């Protein structure tokens, strides 16, 4: 047959086949059999877009004809036009053609073996070359890029994955995972690259798709790939490294032709660097690695090319090394000369001096050398330590002011109150008395009211602790009233202590401070000091000795003068009487202690400390002063000296008496320092100065204290001192200061005296205590160095300079009558110890001031008081000597504690001593007799040596004994006694709320609450979570409440931040299960996590300097902006792709030239004069700090896939994690479990955001403008509702309401409000609420422009660290601190929560939002939220009865009785209705009508509960929404314990919010003295905008369930302006209370958004349900907690906390049916174990009519069938809640013992009693006898249950008698009940 005939027949056949297929039924199986079997066709070709029929034919061949073809040796081909064009047209492969041409190219002779030998050396040097050229690599055969590689790269690039992770066997649809937008992007890119695409390419495997493209692919890169490569080169390569350069390098380095270059560049595209490469070398290295990858993909060997290139390069290098340097110089000499001449000519033309810079440089060099020489000289002369030491550190801006004693007084009281209640303080000891004194020192009217409220509301019946706190409180109130107008005093009641050194049997030396036996208080201490000791006794004769000498002299004189015997006798008698008198006289008895008028000598404090507190305000009158007890012959341990004419300072009894009497008064009655202005230096922690500072503040002084180590820790220390001791009127100002700096000394004094207007204090000093010093140890004369000189400068020179500056300031202001008393720190160490540098000289030199006071002109401005400070234990200088202090005291010397020495020094500030100083300088010896110890240094050395020797001997004996013991008893003899250290293990808990015993709940909640509320209208929080700067809600709470992480907190944070991961398997060859370090893979034990990672955790969590890696490289120090510039001259050309070049031309027109580069196909672009450029510039922005999520936080850690992470905005990831954790906190491990209880339409999402996906917005605007790669569907990620959409798509699959609030900073509270409204409206039963917002540079910059945020640079200038830059409510607050994160709560109906058994963290009693007034400022704070306290008062005398819960309960009971009657009537009426229905339909009728009656009864009851329980206050102008919300649960406005403030740390907000809360409380009649405790969470977290209210809500729930109220630890000083708000307390430390009933959360957002929510403790919900229901709920929660705990820990271990859903809980077929059946519920699939909807359960009758309904209908049906013409029927309905099973009298009166036993054993005791009671009532009604009244007992009617038989009736007593009289022979009864009611029907039969 001719070919043309065959072709024509084939055409006809094809046409007929197609016509047959279109026109006839498909009979493809038969058709296949015809051409495969009948005709044995070997080549089948399908004409179509995809191999559909071909695929079927292949399957048919495999299944049916495989053995058939093998038998006949048939080889068949199944081809498709769309993919097998080459095979169909027999097109040869290009590689085959190349292979045929190859032999022709191999005509050149093969290289001989000799070619490998080295070439002979050249006879002469080669010509000099400029550089060694890079040798070209051996070229590799070219091959165009294949479509498969191009397709592979384009898909991988779009999916942001590596080539290895994109299998070519998968389809595009599979790879995108359902992301339609990404799929569309890929298809668009493919169309742009390859032109046309086959039909449905997304469903074709990539390898098949590549083959399809290859047929029409030219091998050249298309538009898309060229554009991507151009972008890669321009954005990631270094400047000048163009695509031409890249191609040239690939050609020369690797010998790759253009096609191969395309392949390498494509591979590079799929491995794009994260950031621009820094240098050309980096770019080449990158290309090298890409070339190797390409070679491995296509199977090319690059080694030969590389070796050829390397060898040639080496040869070139060798040639270059042989160049003659001299010849090169000779050649280039003339060029250099010519260039220099041209340069000089141009300079002369431009009138420039080329040597001017050189001359200036030489001059500057000489100047620098001279300055350096001076510096070197100063360093050599003064020493490095001295030069560095004098650096200035003072700054006015860093001054910290503490003066809010009014607030700390209340805080101290509350702390004391709760410490006693919690048993921390079990009795009133010295510490409590001291705290009482501090409180009295701060007494004011507000404080007294505060105490009166708390003490009057203390319930003594709760236990001894409450009794103690009430007794102490009442005493303290009286004390404060008495001292209300009295100046504060310094009074120390601590027990004086002494040194105690002990050496145990093992030779360990221990030192401790022990109370002194005979000195129990400071008054006795003063007495001890006055008495002195043997060592201080002077060598003066006693009175007796003097009298004896007088007696002897008179006797001798009498003998000479012959005195009469009578006179002698009289004289002898007189002498004898006088001696007797001296012996018995108490006037000079040194052991006699001070006598107090009206007081016992015995220490009252040791007998009864509560009485001591009561006596504190009483001033003691001293009848006999301590000075009168000073022995004549003894010098007191403390005394004043007077200068003798000889210039010595000697003990002066009179002055000392004055001083000691003053100390005594201070010890008994305290001493005030009110209106004293004091400067003190050297008052660091653990110093004498710090104790002096405490006393000054306690006495009401205003003090400036300096510190040389200014830091947050130091300022916190001083703040804690002020908070504890600061009395009313006192002020503490802390400043950085270097006493070694002259500038600092001058600046400090100027700051103190300068006016407030100029930034100074405007003070005039009354006292200066310059105690600053540095230790000098081991420095003898030959080692005097710069440190000694610097110390001398601190301790002498600059003390004098400081005094001089004060004198200068006083003189300048004309202050002549108010001299400042300078307490000079003298020392008894006048070289006694030695080896202390210039310490002794510094102290001795201060004594010159005593003379200069008289000789110079500053006596009117300064007075001098030298204090010789004795041995003071525990200070920085003396702590090493503590162990020998006891030995020193055995010598008779008195050493001192820091408190004792501070007391001594403060005694020098008493008015008596101050007055002495104004007359003449005073020298106070506070040495304790140390100066009387001879050879002190040798003695102390001896003491130390003895201690060490004793220690060593005992240690040796101990070791010897132990060895002997082991020898005798064996090595394991002590094993049983060995100490075993239990290693802690982390156990992260979910912190489900504690569920108290029901009786305890009923003691908390009012009894009337039970059954009062419609629980479907009570909204509860069942779960909450967050992602924030401190990780999760658990870890944030640890840091907020306790200020540190627990072991569990550290483990969780380390896991969150990626420091550790869990390992279960072999590790280094051994099985290991536990945590490992994520980097090293080394095991990490739980106990080591805190020590190993906590520092890093704290550094990279919370509020900190912005970390650029978290924000796309954003560095506020280099905030990027662009500026438009017009090109003034033509620029150098650069390379670009054709497409880019054309775009430049399109924009700039004739201002740009573009030309093609023929070699590469790229374009040269040249910008001409007049073109416009946008040039980046960097701005130094001043907002450098933010609250950032922990570094290392990764959504993948929680189980979120890379696909989702790459697709969504980061804020969406925060939300997804928060929602999952909130569900886990709810005990819900599978969100589909909700659909077991509710319909899919009843789960809503009301979470929202202030700005939404700001990263997406940034991509849309900034990145897109910069033409950076941005996903095409970025728009969808910017929508604020997208986050909620992802939650639904990945987790919950609900079809309920979705509402997206946008309320700026008030979004979260608005979300709660909307969620509550959504549930109350019936649109949902469960809602996800919360808020979220991100931090990005754009928002940060704009907030900064508004001056709303904290200026970091200013904060640094003020010495603030990032952690303390958010300081709500403080004097220095200066703007809010931005943060990022998400917060979520799960809220639902209380009734549903109880049924599900989920934990209930709190009740949302109220949620509201409000706007403000007319204005022009969007962010201005307002008070619109005050409307939640709106309440009409006018002249209404009595409160609304609706506020009385008993009244409301009474109304509800009445209404319940009506409902009961209605149900009974309706059920009885059913009998008549049923008679009208055909008998075959009666059962159905009764079922439906019974259900309707039940529904209506339930509806009526809920309406009644709603009216009298939930909504009684609504629309009542006399009851504020806030008051009504609390009253719903039996609470009053006084029960609102905590207010969580929005507290942004801005001046305006904190004042406005405080005023708003204060006015609410005041208007609603909150009791005076009962402020709400303010919580300011943002001090820790910063301000996350949309998430703010959610985090506050989480914190409020944690407060409710723990009773712990976190303090605002950044509140170093509360603003004075806030003192006016009496109903708010601002604590700075955490308070552990005995319970919090309710918490308010307020939130304010830009745009007139104000919001408030009230959450109430869940105990008040439990009080509203029955005990049975509560116990059932407790069991459910317990089970749920266990499963949630297991799920959570497995999730952490395996990184599976987030488990995304792949499918909805219903099939596509059931989707519409599920939506349309509100009673559709999921059930567990037996095969898969998953929760799904089953078609059997949709529109099922069982889901509407339950078993109880069937039972009730059956009873009614039986009733209708009974023939009761001679009998009676009784129907009774009882609400379950109406039976009070707690009333024992009611139970025993109406139920028999058997009935009680039966009912009590049932799962629902109350329901069983209700059913039994209902049966009794029904029986009575069926008897038809006369009632004995509503109060008649029904015990005579007994309902008997035998086994599981139906209940029977037995009548007794009066009931039996009445039945017999009525002729009743039998009674039958039926009972049914559900959660709402019990129904009983009784039928009686008569004779």
Swiss-Prot record:
Keyword Transferase among UniProt keywords: yes
Catalytic function, reaction form: acetyl-CoA + n malonyl-CoA + 2n NADPH + 4n H(+) = a long-chain-acyl-CoA + n CoA + n CO2 + 2n NADP(+); a fatty acyl-[ACP] + malonyl-[ACP] + H(+) = a 3-oxoacyl-[ACP] + holo-[ACP] + CO2; a (3R)-hydroxyacyl-[ACP] + NADP(+) = a 3-oxoacyl-[ACP] + NADPH + H(+)
Annotated ranges, domain Carrier: 145-220
Modification sites for O-(pantetheine 4'-phosphoryl)serine: 180
Region spans: Beta-ketoacyl reductase: 675-874
Note: Present with 17000 molecules/cell in log phase SD medium.
Protein name, per record: Fatty acid synthase subunit alpha
């Amino acid at each position: 047959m001719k070919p043309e005939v065959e072709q024509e027949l084939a055409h006809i056949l094809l046409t007929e086949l197609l016509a047959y297929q279109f026109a006839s039924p498909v009979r493809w199986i038969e058709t296949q059999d015809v051409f495969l079997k009948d005709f044995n066709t070997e080549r089948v070709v399908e004409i179509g877009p995809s191999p559909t029929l071909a695929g079927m034919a292949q399957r048919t061949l495999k299944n049916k004809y495989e053995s058939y073809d093998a038998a006949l040796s048939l080889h068949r081909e199944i081809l498709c036009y769309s993919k097998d064009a080459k095979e169909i047209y027999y097109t040869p492969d290009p590689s085959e053609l190349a292979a045929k041409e190859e032999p022709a190219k191999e005509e050149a002779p093969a290289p001989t073996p000799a070619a490998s030998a080295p070439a002979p050396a050249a006879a002469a040097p080669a010509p000099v070359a400029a550089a060694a050229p890079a040798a070209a690599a051996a070229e590799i055969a070219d091959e165009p890029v294949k479509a498969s590689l191009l397709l592979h790269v384009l898909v991988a690039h779009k999916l942001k994955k590596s080539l290895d992770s994109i299998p070519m066997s998968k389809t595009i649809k599979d790879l995108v995972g359902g992301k339609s937008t990404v799929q569309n992007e890929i298809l668009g890119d493919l169309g742009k690259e390859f032109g046309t695409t086959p039909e449905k390419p997304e469903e074709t495997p990539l390898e098949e798709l590549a083959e399809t493209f290859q047929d029409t692919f030219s091998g050249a890169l298309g538009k898309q790939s060229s554009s991507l490569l151009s972008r890669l080169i321009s954005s990631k390569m270094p400047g000048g490294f163009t695509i031409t350069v890249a191609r040239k390098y690939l050609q020369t380095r690797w010998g790759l032709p253009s096609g191969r270059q395309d392949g390498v560049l494509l591979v590079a595209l799929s491995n794009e660097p994260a950031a621009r490469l820094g240098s050309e070398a980096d770019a080449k290295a990158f290309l090298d690695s890409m070339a190797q990858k390409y070679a491995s993909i296509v199977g090319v060997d690059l080694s030969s090319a590389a070796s050829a290139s390397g060898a040639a390069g080496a040869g070139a290098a060798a040639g270059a090394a042989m160049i003659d340097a001299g010849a090169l110089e000779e050649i280039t000499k003339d060029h250099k000369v010519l260039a220099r001449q041209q340069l000089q000519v141009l300079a002369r033309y431009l009138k420039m001096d080329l040597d001017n810079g050189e001359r200036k440089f030489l001059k500057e060099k000489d100047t620098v050398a001279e300055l350096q020489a001076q510096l070197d000289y100063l360093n050599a002369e003064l020493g490095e330590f001295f030069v560095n030491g004098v650096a200035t550190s003072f700054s006015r801006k860093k001054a910290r002011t503490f003066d809010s004693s009014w607030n700390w007084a209340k805080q101290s009281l509350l702390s004391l109150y709760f410490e006693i209640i919690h048993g921390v303080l079990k009795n009133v000891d010295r510490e409590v008395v001291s705290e009482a004194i501090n409180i009295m020192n701060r007494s004011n009217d507000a404080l007294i009211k505060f105490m009166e409220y708390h003490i009057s509301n203390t319930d003594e019946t709760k236990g001894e602790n409450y009794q103690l706190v009430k007794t102490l409180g009442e005493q303290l109130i009286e004390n404060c009233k008495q001292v209300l107008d009295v100046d504060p005093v310094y009074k120390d009641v601590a027990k004086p202590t002494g040194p105690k050194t002990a050496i145990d049997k093992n030779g360990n030396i221990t030192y401790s401070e022990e109370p002194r036996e005979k000195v129990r208080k400071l008054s006795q201490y003063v007495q001890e000091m006055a008495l002195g000791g043997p060592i201080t006794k002077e060598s003066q004769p006693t009175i007796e000795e003097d009298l004896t000498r007088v007696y002897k002299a008179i006797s001798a004189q009498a003998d000479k003068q012959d005195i009469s015997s009578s006179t002698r006798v009289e004289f002898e008698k007189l002498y004898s009487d006088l001696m007797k008198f001296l012996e018995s006289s108490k006037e000079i008895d040194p052991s006699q202690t001070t006598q107090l008028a009206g007081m016992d000598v015995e220490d009252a404090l040791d007998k009864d400390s509560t009485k001591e507190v009561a006596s504190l305000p009483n001033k003691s009158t001293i009848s006999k002063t301590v000075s009168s007890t000073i022995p004549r012959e003894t010098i007191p341990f403390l005394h004043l000296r007077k200068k003798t004419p000889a210039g010595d300072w000697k003990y002066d009894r009179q002055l000392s008496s004055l001083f000691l009497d003053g100390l005594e008064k201070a010890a008994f009655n305290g001493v005030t320092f009110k209106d004293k202005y004091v400067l003190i230096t050297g008052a660091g922690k653990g110093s004498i100065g710090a104790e002096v500072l405490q006393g000054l503040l306690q006495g009401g002084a205003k003090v400036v204290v300096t510190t040389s180590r200014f830091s947050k820790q130091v300022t916190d220390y001083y703040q804690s001192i002020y908070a504890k001791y600061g009395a009313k009127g006192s002020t503490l100002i802390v400043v950085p200061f270097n006493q070694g700096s002259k500038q600092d000394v001058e600046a400090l004094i100027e700051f103190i005296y300068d006016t407030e207007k100029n930034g100074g204090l405007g003070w005039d000093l009354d006292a200066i205590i310059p105690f600053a010093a540095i230790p000098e140890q081991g420095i003898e004369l030959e080692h005097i160095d710069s440190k000694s000189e610097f110390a001398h400068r601190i301790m002498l020179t600059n003390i004098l300079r400081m005094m001089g500056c004060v004198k200068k300031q006083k003189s300048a202001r004309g202050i002549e009558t108010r001299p400042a008393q300078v307490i000079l720190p003298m020392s008894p160490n006048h070289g006694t110890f030695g080896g202390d540098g210039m310490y002794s000289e510094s102290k001795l030199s201060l004594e010159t001031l005593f003379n200069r006071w008289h000789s110079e002109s500053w006596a009117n401005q300064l007075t001098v008081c030298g204090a010789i400070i004795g041995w003071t234990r525990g200070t920085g200088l003396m702590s090493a000597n503590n162990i020998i202090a006891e030995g020193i005291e055995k010598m008779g010397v008195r050493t001192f504690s820091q408190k004792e020495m501070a007391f001594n020094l403060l005694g020098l500030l008493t008015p008596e001593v101050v007055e002495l100083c104004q007359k003449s300088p005073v020298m106070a010896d506070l040495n304790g007799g140390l100066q009387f110890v001879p050879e002190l240094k040798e003695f102390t050395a001896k003491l130390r040596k003895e201690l060490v020797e004793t220690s060593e001997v005992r240690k040796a004996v101990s070791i010897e004994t132990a060895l002997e013991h082991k020898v005798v008893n064996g090595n394991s003899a002590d094993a049983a006694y060995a100490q075993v250290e239990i290693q802690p293990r982390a156990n992260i808990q979910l912190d489900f709320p504690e569920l108290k015993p029901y009786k305890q709940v009923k003691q908390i909640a009012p009894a009337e609450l039970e059954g009062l509320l419609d629980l479907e209208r009570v909204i509860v929080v069942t779960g909450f979570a967050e992602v924030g700067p401190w990780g999760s809600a658990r870890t944030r709470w640890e840091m907020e409440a306790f200020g540190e992480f627990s072991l569990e907190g550290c483990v969780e944070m380390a896991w969150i931040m990626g420091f550790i991961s869990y390992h279960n398997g072999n590790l280094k060859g051994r099985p290991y299960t536990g945590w490992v370090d994520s980097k090293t893979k080394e095991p990490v034990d739980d106990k080591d996590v805190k020590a190993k990672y906590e520092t890093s955790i704290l550094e990279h969590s919370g509020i900190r300097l912005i970390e650029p890696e978290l924000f796309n490289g954003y560095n506020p120090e280099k905030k990027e902006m662009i500026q438009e510039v017009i090109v003034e001259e033509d620029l150098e050309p650069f390379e670009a792709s054709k497409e880019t070049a054309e775009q430049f031309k399109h924009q700039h027109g004739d201002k740009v030239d573009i030309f093609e580069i023929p070699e590469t196909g790229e374009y040269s672009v040249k910008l001409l004069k007049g073109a416009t450029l946008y040039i980046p510039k960097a701005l130094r922005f001043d907002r450098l700090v933010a609250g950032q999520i922990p570094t290392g936080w990764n959504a993948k850690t929680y189980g979120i896939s890379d696909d989702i992470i790459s697709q969504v905005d980061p804020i969406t990831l925060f939300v997804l994690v928060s929602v999952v954790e909130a569900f886990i906190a709810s005990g819900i491990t599978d969100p589909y479990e909700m659909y077991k209880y509710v319909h899919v339409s009843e789960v809503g999402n009301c979470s929202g955001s202030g700005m939404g996906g700001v990263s997406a917005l940034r991509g849309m605007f900034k990145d897109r403008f910069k033409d950076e790669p941005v996903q095409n569907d970025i728009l969808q990620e910017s929508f604020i509702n997208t986050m909620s959409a992802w939650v639904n798509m990945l987790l919950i699959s609900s079809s309920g309401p979705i509402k997206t609030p946008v309320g700026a900073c008030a979004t979260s509270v608005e979300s709660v409000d909307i969620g509550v409204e959504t549930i109350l409206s019936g649109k949902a039963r469960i809602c996800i609420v919360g808020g979220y917002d991100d931090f990005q540079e754009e928002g940060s910059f704009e907030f900064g422009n508004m001056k709303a945020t904290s200026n970091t640079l200013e904060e640094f200038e003020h010495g603030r660290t990032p952690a303390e830059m958010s300081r709500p409510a403080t004097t220095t607050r200066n703007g809010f601190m931005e943060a990022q994160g998400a917060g979520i709560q799960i809220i639902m109906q209380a009734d549903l929560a109880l049924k599900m058994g989920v934990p209930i963290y709190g009740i949302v009693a109220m949620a509201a939002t409000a706007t403000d007034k007319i204005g022009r400022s969007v962010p201005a704070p307002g008070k619109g939220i005050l409307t939640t306290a709106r309440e009409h008062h006018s002249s209404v005398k009595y409160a609304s009865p609706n506020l009385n819960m008993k009244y409301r309960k009474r109304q509800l009971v009445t209404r319940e009785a009506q409902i009961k009657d209605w149900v009974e009537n309706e059920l009885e009426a059913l009998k008549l209705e049923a008679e009208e229905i055909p008998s075959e339909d009666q059962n159905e009728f009764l079922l439906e009508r019974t259900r309707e009656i039940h529904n209506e009864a339930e509806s009526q009851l809920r309406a009644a509960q709603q009216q009298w329980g939930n909504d009684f206050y609504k629309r009542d102008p006399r009851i504020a929404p806030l008051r009504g919300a609390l009253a719903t649960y039996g609470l009053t406005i006084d029960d609102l314990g905590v207010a969580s403030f929005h507290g942004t740390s801005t001046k305006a907000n904190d004042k406005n919010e405080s005023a708003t809360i204060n006015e609410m409380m005041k208007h609603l009649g909150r009791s005076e003295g009962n402020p709400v405790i303010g919580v300011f969470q943002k001090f820790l977290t910063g301000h996350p905008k949309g998430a703010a209210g959610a985090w506050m809500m989480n914190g409020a729930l944690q407060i409710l369930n723990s009773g712990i109220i976190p303090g605002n630890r950044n509140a170093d000083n509360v603003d004075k302006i806030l003192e006016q708000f009496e109903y708010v307390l601002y604590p700075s430390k955490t308070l552990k209370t005995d319970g919090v009933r309710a918490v308010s959360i307020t939130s304010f957002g830009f745009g007139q958004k104000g919001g408030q929510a009230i959450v109430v403790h869940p105990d008040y919900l439990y009080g509203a349900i029955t005990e049975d229901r509560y116990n059932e709920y407790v069991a459910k929660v317990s089970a749920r907690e266990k499963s949630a705990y297991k799920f959570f820990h497995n999730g952490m271990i395996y990184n599976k906390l987030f488990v995304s859903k792949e499918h909805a809980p219903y099939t596509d077929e059931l989707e519409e049916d599920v939506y349309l059946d509100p009673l559709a519920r999921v059930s567990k699939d037996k095969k898969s174990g998953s929760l799904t909807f089953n078609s059997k359960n949709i529109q099922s009758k069982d889901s509407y009519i339950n078993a109880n309904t069937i039972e009730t209908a059956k009873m009614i049906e039986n009733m209708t069938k009974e023939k009761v013409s001679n009998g009676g029927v009784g129907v009774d309905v009882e609400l379950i809640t109406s039976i009070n099973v707690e009333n024992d009298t009611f139970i025993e009166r109406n139920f028999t013992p058997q009935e009680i036993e039966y009912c009590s054993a049932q799962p629902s005791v109350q329901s069983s009693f209700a059913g039994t009671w209902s049966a009794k009532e029904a029986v009575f009604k069926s008897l038809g006898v006369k009632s004995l009244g509503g109060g008649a007992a029904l015990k005579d009617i007994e309902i008997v249950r035998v086994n599981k038989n139906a209940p029977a009736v037995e009548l007794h007593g009066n009931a039996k008698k009445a039945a017999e009289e009525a002729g009743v022979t039998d009674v039958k009864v039926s009972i049914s009940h559900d959660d709402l009611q019990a129904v009983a029907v009784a039928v009686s039969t008569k004779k």
